[in-house]
UniProtKB/Swiss-Prot annotation:
Keywords: Aminoacyl-tRNA synthetase, ATP-binding, Cytoplasm, Ligase, Metal-binding, Nucleotide-binding, Protein biosynthesis, RNA-binding, tRNA-binding, Zinc
GO terms of molecular function: ATP binding; metal ion binding; threonine-tRNA ligase activity; tRNA binding
Residues reported in the UniProt entry to bind Zn(2+): 331, 382, 508
Family assignment from sequence similarity: Belongs to the class-II aminoacyl-tRNA synthetase family.
EC number: 6.1.1.3
Record-annotated TGS domain positions: 1-59
Species the sequence originates in: Vesicomyosocius okutanii subsp. Calyptogena okutanii (strain HA)
UniProt-listed InterPro entries: aa-tRNA-synt_IIb (IPR002314), aa-tRNA-synth_II (IPR006195), aa-tRNA-synth_II/BPL/LPL (IPR045864), Anticodon-bd (IPR004154), Anticodon-bd_dom_sf (IPR036621), Beta-grasp_dom_sf (IPR012675), TGS (IPR004095), TGS-like (IPR012676)
Example GO biological process: threonyl-tRNA aminoacylation
Protein name: Threonine--tRNA ligase
Native organism taxonomy: Bacteria, Pseudomonadati, Pseudomonadota, Gammaproteobacteria, Candidatus Pseudothioglobaceae
Length: 636
């Protein structure tokens, strides 16, 4: 006679063994039930409860329910695929953010058109309302089962499992797959999905293994959520920085230099605007800007510990009998500057900053426009300080970071604090001081932050700053990392007030992280419609006829002299054609000059979006732009 306790404390008494589905039916939830959580363990609705237990019915409204839907849909994908392509071997199909994927080994290869066929077949299976049943077999029985089916990859997975294990499998129709589960009770629960794309993937993620084909999909608990997600993807595609970068002639990347950016003139203006703003931030907040070499002898990277941890992503070269690495980060070089001359405690905190160009040999499959590259510039800074100075420095940096993000239009910031891992260097006393300093600095700001216990680096705790863009996508940009290890490894010292040599703490800090990535985020956040102060071109001036050309040339000179970023279009084309063309470039202003404007020494001003501001003098227009522009006269 099991007594079932529900989340609200209600108790249900049953005369005999009862399934999760039967309990759900007694609650009027049988149609919504996808699975159950019995005493903290997720189980299928067919699971039998034999003794008293705590039970939560899992539905599509729960995060766990959504994950079960997605995992079950991955299996639906595998079933539908093998029905159409019997030679396709199944491998794995996990849940990922917003969806799932399944990897297949198929020598003929899938085409984009095949996804349409597979998706149609999946919908057919949904309509058939196939019951999804769990059963168990011994490891050896399961191994033989998949050997008989000729499923090479499933065999490989099972061979890695100890022989005494009992394995769970799920059956829907004629399709059987290895899985821990749980799954939804029937395919009818899997109505709201879409297959998204094909990609390549190595078996077990190892590039030395064979390449498989990965099919990505998304699945949701209801049709509306699916529509909202697909609409968001359309928004993302429309804002894709790669597309906008090409349309606005900002940058390109080519085959001969994968992961390295060719900045075009307008893109370089945008880059410089951001860099020069950050240079002012450095200057106004007590940082000394430095510059360090690109090539550094391998021996320094060995001393710093980077060779062991990052050697596989370093670009290297040999000259004579010496091995060099192109720097993947700037910190060891900054310590070399610090080490030039003995420092006193009176010199601390010492803040060094650099727009450091770094190279990392990232896998080609991870490269993505200017968001993920092999050559990037960091707004990198290192603060050399005492343990007692950590809190004040962290507090100042938090304010600085929030101000920078707000300046560029990002108001939603999440913060995560990662604390000591099991394997670490430094005494517990130093870790205590550092973590307390970070916690107190965060709490003093009265901001919400998330604790990630044990997620810090081996050399110190860290704070991560994650900004949200206009689509609520999260981007981890800023970091502040406490480091007890590297200054000691590289011999950084200072003389304390008692004339004793001590090792400083280093605070590694960056606000944007990679300038390239931050610019990609900006491009997508604004969809190429930058505020006037950030726009590479603030205005384009067009003539109605050829006789207005000289007047426009003089206006351009005058505007540029005042620090405005302007261009002219004097082509012998219709005004409407030129306005339409430049509107697509999303410049803040289009200025039109005809007979009336030339006679009065004015320009007719159209604001981005088509709003007509009427005619005004050149001086009035300059004042208007200067009022909007926070970075005027930076680039001329």
């Amino acid at each position: 006679m099991p007594i079932i306790t529900l989340p609200d404390g209600t108790k249900k008494i049953f005369e005999q063994v009862v399934s999760v589905e039967q309990v759900a039916k007694s609650m009027g939830l049988v149609k919504a039930a996808l699975a159950g959580e019995v005493d903290g363990e997720l189980v299928s609705t067919s699971f039998l409860i034999k003794t008293d237990a705590n039970l939560t019915i899992i539905t599509a409204n729960d995060d766990q329910g959504l994950e079960i839907i997605r995992h079950s849909t991955a299996h639906l994908l595998a079933q539908a695929t093998q029905m159409l392509y019997p030679d396709a071997q199944v491998t794995i199909g996990p849940v990922i953010d917003n969806g799932f994927y399944y990897d297949f080994a198929y020598k003929n290869g899938f085409l984009e058109g095949d996804l349409i066929k597979i998706e149609k077949n999946m919908h057919k299976l949904v309509k058939q309302n196939l019951k999804i049943e769990k059963f168990e077999m011994s490891r050896d029985e399961t191994l033989q089962f998949f050997k008989d089916k000729g499923e090479y990859y499933k065999v490989k997975i099972i061979e890695s499992i100890s022989t005494d294990q009992i394995l769970s499998l799920y059956k829907q129709g004629d399709f059987i797959d290895l899985c821990r589960g749980p799954h939804v009770p029937s395919t009818a629960k899997l109505k709201n999905f879409k297959l998204m794309k094909l990609a390549g993937a190595y078996w077990r993620g190892d590039s030395s293994n064979e390449m498989l084909q990965r099919v990505y999909g998304t699945a949701w608990g209801n049709e509306q959520d699916l529509k909202v997600y697909l609409h968001k993807l359309e928004e993302v595609a429309r804002r894709d920085h790669r597309k906008i970068g090409k349309t606005q002639d900002l940058f390109h990347i080519q085959e001969e230099t994968p992961g390295m950016v060719f900045w075009h003139a307008k893109g370089w203006i945008l880059y410089q605007l951001v860099e020069q703003y950050m240079r002012g931030i450095f200057r106004d907040n007590g940082y000394q800007e430095v510059h360090t070499p690109q090539l550094i002898d391998k021996s320094l990277w060995e001393k710093s510990g980077h060779w062991d941890k990052f050697g596989d992503v370093m670009f290297t070269t040999t000259s004579g009998d010496r091995d060099y690495a192109v720097k993947p980060m700037n910190c060891p070089a900054h310590i070399q500057i610090y080490n030039q001359g003995l420092k006193s405690y009176r010199n601390l905190p010492l803040r060094l900053a650099e727009f450091g160009s770094c190279h990392r040999n990232e896998p080609s499959g991870t490269l993505h426009g200017i968001m993920r590259v092999r050559n990037f510039v960091q707004d990198d800074g290192h603060i050399f300080c005492t343990p007692e100075q950590i809190q004040d420095e962290v507090s100042t940096f938090i304010d600085l970071t929030f101000n920078v993000y707000k300046y560029f239009g990002f108001e939603k910031i999440n913060i995560k604090l990662s604390t000591r891992p099991k394997k670490r260097v430094g005494s517990d006393e130093v870790w205590d001081k550092s973590e307390i300093a970070l916690v107190e600095a965060l709490n003093a700001k009265n901001i919400v932050w998330e604790l990630q216990e044990g997620e810090g680096a081996f050399y110190g705790p860290k704070i991560e700053f994650i900004l949200k863009d206009c689509l609520d996508r999260q981007w981890q940009c800023g970091t502040l990392q406490v480091d007890f290890s590297m200054p000691k490894r590289l011999g950084a010292q200072f003389i304390d007030e008692n004339s004793v040599k001590k090792t400083p703490v280093i605070l590694h800090r960056a606000i944007m992280g990679s300038l390239e990535r931050f610019l990609g985020i900006l491009i997508e956040h604004y969809e190429g419609a930058y505020p006037c102060w950030l726009s590479p071109i603030q205005a384009v001036i067009i003539n109605i006829s050829e006789k207005h050309a000289k007047f426009i040339v003089d206006i351009v000179k005058k505007l540029k002299k005042q620090g405005l970023r302007v261009i002219s279009d004097l082509r012998n084309e219709k005004v409407s054609f030129k306005i339409r063309e430049h509107s697509l470039q999303r410049y803040p202003y289009i200025l039109v000059v005809g007979d009336r404007e030339m006679e009065k020494g004015q320009v007719s001003v159209r604001q981005r979006g088509g709003k007509d501001l009427g005619a005004m003098s050149v001086g009035t227009f300059i004042k208007k732009v200067n009022q909007e522009t926070l970075l005027k006269n930076q680039i001329k």
